[in-house]
């Protein structure tokens, strides 16, 4: 997947979940690049803000969108990496 595809999928997911995507283009591009880098290195778009352990059973939880993002958005208004935001 290239960066445009990752961004497109992220936007589609956000729309489906009634979230928004970070409006700060610089931060958004930083996160998308991090997702792409992790895909190239590990084969999955792991959240660039979380630690990859090498134990896939554990690490699968941090494939974007990670299992934690909905609770984080509810609590803070955004996920840890600030890709997804509450509207």
Spans of model-derived segments:
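Long, distal/terminal scaffolding or interaction modules
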Residues: 1-87
């Amino acid at each position: 997947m290239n960066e445009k595809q990752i961004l497109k999928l992220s936007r589609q997911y956000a729309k489906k979940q009634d979230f928004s995507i970070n409006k700060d283009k610089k931060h958004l591009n930083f996160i998308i690049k991090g997702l792409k880098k992790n895909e190239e290195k590990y084969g999955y778009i792991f959240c660039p803000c979380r630690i990859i352990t090498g134990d896939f059973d554990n690490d699968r939880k941090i494939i974007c969108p990670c299992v934690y993002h909905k609770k984080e958005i509810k609590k803070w208004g955004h996920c840890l990496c600030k890709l997804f935001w509450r509207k």
